[in-house]
Regions:
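Structural motif
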Residues: 415, 525-526, 565
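Catalytic cores of nucleophile-dependent amide-cleaving enzymes
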Residues: 9, 142-147, 444-469, 529-620
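Domain-scale, conserved, charged regions that form catalytic cores
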Residues: 2-514, 518-522, 536-537, 700-718
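Active-site-proximal C-terminal subdomain of hydrolase catalytic domains
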Residues: 28, 159, 167-169, 175-183, ...
Length: 718
């Protein structure tokens, strides 16, 4: 839907105004322009474009640049409160040179800064800038007469550029905004940083928090470049010391009523780089053209579990006599450095603490595979082991993360964002999975390019909850499929319970062309897919079953316009044990979805329909109540977290009622108590339910109703 405050740009059609209207011409837009790259040229282990390494300096610079022209004049604490609350985020994005060529400046922003790191990208970016109606500041590591070098770029240079833009072209915006912009620009001065007692250890495990602290106006203590240790505990201490320093800033700043206007962003980011899933395979070193030292170093990367690096004398001797291995190690170091800078930039925009994990979290996948195979077993006696296998998986996760990091999360609470491939949603926090304890969202670490696009984020969109009651439901079940009618029946029941409240567009499709036509023809902000999902079988293809064929959603990117919210009621759309990153959930993100709710395990047709029924009922009833109780906006992550918690509570209480554990009608009273706890955003909501049985004379805690009995948790992205 168009912005309520569009700016009509001279020379642009009304259609373009609707599509590209900029509601805030005081915002500064930053573009990282890269050369076009083929997929087969991405980095080997995590899938980054090779242009990222040549722009890593730009990520660090962005962390200290203002989001808009008024920002440098605001009191620091007031600015930080806005950032913590979800406002004043940077508008930045990576873009290929060919895509830039197809854009007009007005489609990008009013005041624009470009960064380039290669000669071809710099040349094309400069040519594009020369065609635009307003000047564009071009910062490049490639020295040309029309570019600014990274070393010369600073707040004063940016100020002078912004002043020139608003003086010469301020007539294109409203007079009051032009006056405000020019008045603020004249008052720009570098802030005097606040010193804190934290040494600047030069290591990628602490760098993200250093970026956060510098953007928060803090200066660090003694710099120790290229810091390292042979003691794993030293890394843990350094990570948590830097993360605690960020939390101290948040505590000192506090919140104000302005935070009610914005959604709360994650306060903790859990991150760990990963290899492509297939890259963990040992393979057969016999017959390989790689030198033994190179094979040895790749194996070390595959098997690494801690941050401390120890190498045996024999291995060291191998490295001394062969230099080929350096290329593989350098590539992996580059990937890690890019993720480090990207995560740091994302966290810096909301003053979030970054907790780097240990590579051991990526080694729980054998446990995942064992658990997932058991869930899929046809024999019900085999599936009886599922709770035990889930417990083993959670224990392995807890060991990999470590008690110190878990204590940090417990101490400060959520919201939490995961930037990792590991299933950290299942990490036990006081007996409850992380995703049920705290509001949790995720960005996958592979492929790297997709991760960086998600880290760039988007300008938040605020809507009335009633706008979300228009839903497209696409069903692809065959006519003879026994699961075909469960969703339709659930939606009919929803209409009986909440008559006239929803606009449900239910469409059945039998071909890929029909699917694309239905999705493109809908204006609903939410799409629910009801059908069969197919997990990657090891050949790099996970998809949806439509018309008897498996459809790779990624291949529809040039044909399909994806709605912002996608909910997948299909099996294994981001499988726990998927052998590659090519999942349905990832694919919908890659083709344009803002958020995806995917499944990590098989789901029954009846259970999937029940979940959708509850989720939509939740939108209509819980969301307005939560807004009233919390007296602020709520995020989509909070909405979905509420669905998961209340669904689990309802399942537990129904289970106990069927067993005769709870007296008649007492389950409703207990559920109302849980509902109040969830409405209050209480992370102890599960304990509230477990203890509330005392009012009915029942000790719920003495019965087997732990969440491990309900292991099929959906997975969600921000």
């Amino acid at each position: 839907m168009p912005s309520p405050d569009l700016i009509s740009w001279p020379g642009r059609s009304p259609e373009a105004n609707q599509a590209y209207g900029i509601s805030d011409p005081l915002r500064i837009t930053y573009l990282l322009v890269m050369e076009d790259e083929r997929l087969d040229r991405m980095t080997a282990f995590q899938g980054f474009g090779r242009g990222w390494w040549l722009l890593i300096w730009a990520l660090y610079q962005l962390a200290e640049l203002p989001a808009q022209v008024l920002e440098p004049t605001w009191p620091l604490d007031s600015l930080l409160r806005q950032r913590i609350g979800g406002a004043s985020g940077l508008s930045w994005m990576p873009i290929m040179a060919s895509a830039l060529d197809s854009l007009m400046l007005d489609e990008v922003g009013f005041c624009v800064v470009m960064f380039t790191g290669t000669e071809p990208a710099a040349r094309r970016a400069a040519a594009w800038a020369a065609r635009q109606p307003r000047p564009v500041l071009h910062v490049s590591s490639i020295a040309t007469p029309r570019t600014m070098t990274p070393d010369a770029m600073n707040l004063i240079v940016l100020r002078d550029h912004c002043r020139a833009v608003y003086q010469a072209h301020g007539g294109e915006i409203s007079p009051d905004r032009r006056a405000r912009a020019l008045e603020a620009i004249e008052a720009w001065t570098p802030r005097q940083p606040v010193s804190i007692d934290l040494d600047e250890l030069g290591h990628n495990c602490t760098t993200p928090n250093h970026m956060v602290l510098r953007r928060a106006g803090r200066s660090l203590g003694e710099g120790i470049p290229h810091w390292s240790s042979i003691d794993e505990d030293a890394y843990t201490a350094a990570i948590l010391a830097s993360a605690t320093a960020v939390m101290d800033v948040r505590k000192a700043v506090g919140t104000s009523n302005v935070n009610r206007l914005f959604v709360p962003l994650p306060k903790i980011v859990l991150t760990e780089p990963a290899l492509f899933r297939f890259a963990y395979g040992r393979g057969d070193s016999r017959g390989t053209s790689l030198a033994p030292a190179t094979v040895m170093m790749i194996r070390r990367m595959q098997q690494q579990k801690g941050l401390a690096h120890l190498i045996e004398p024999k291995q060291l001797s191998m490295l001394e006599h062969d230099g080929e291995w350096q290329g593989a190690v350098a590539e992996r170091q580059t990937e890690t450095a890019v993720q480090t800078a990207g995560v740091g930039l994302m966290a810096a925009q909301s003053c979030a603490a970054v907790v780097r994990l240990r590579p051991e979290v990526n080694h729980v996948f054998p446990r995942l595979s064992e658990f997932a195979r058991n869930i899929r077993a046809v024999n019900p006696h085999a599936r009886a082991k599922s709770p035990q296998l889930l417990q083993r998986l959670q224990d392995a996760l807890a060991r990999a993360v470590g008690p110190e990091r878990i204590d940090f999360v417990r101490r400060y609470g959520g919201p939490v964002r995961i930037v990792s491939d590991a299933p950290l949603e299942l990490l036990p926090i006081d007996g409850l999975p992380l995703a049920l304890r705290y509001d949790t969202s995720r960005i996958n670490a592979t492929p790297g390019n997709l991760m960086m696009g998600e880290l760039a984020g988007r300008v938040p969109i605020t809507v009335d909850y009633r706008d979300l009651l228009h839903v497209l439901v696409v069903s692809s079940f065959n006519e003879d499929d026994q699961l075909r009618d469960f969703m339709r029946e659930a939606l009919d029941q929803l209409e009986e319970v909440r008559p006239g409240e929803f606009t449900i567009d239910f469409r059945r499709v039998t071909t890929v062309d029909e699917f694309v036509e239905v999705v493109n023809g809908s204006t609903a902000p939410i799409m629910i897919f009801d059908g069969h999902g197919v997990q990657d079988d090891g050949r790099g293809l996970g998809g949806l079953r439509i018309g008897g064929q498996t459809v790779d959603i990624w291949r529809l990117r040039d044909r399909m316009r994806c709605p912002p919210i996608v909910i997948l009621s299909a099996c294994d759309t981001h499988g726990l044990d998927a052998p590659s990153h090519s999942t349905v959930g990832n694919s919908f993100l890659a083709v344009g979805a803002s958020t995806v709710l995917a499944t990590v395990l098989p789901v029954g047709g009846r259970e999937g329909a029940l979940f959708i029924y509850r989720a939509l009922l939740h939108l209509a009833g819980f969301v307005p109540a939560a807004i009233e109780v919390r007296m602020r906006l709520i995020s989509w992550t909070e909405v979905m977290a509420g669905v998961l918690r209340l669904s689990l509570a309802k399942d537990v209480l129904d289970h106990l009622t069927r067993r005769g554990v709870l007296p008649d009608e007492s389950d409703r009273a207990i559920f109302r108590g849980v509902l109040r706890s969830v409405l209050d955003a209480d992370s102890d909501w599960f304990e509230t339910m477990m203890g509330s049985g005392h009012r009915t004379g029942t000790d719920i805690r003495s019965h087997d109703c732990h969440p491990k009995r309900w292991p099929s948790l959906p997975l969600r992205w921000p």
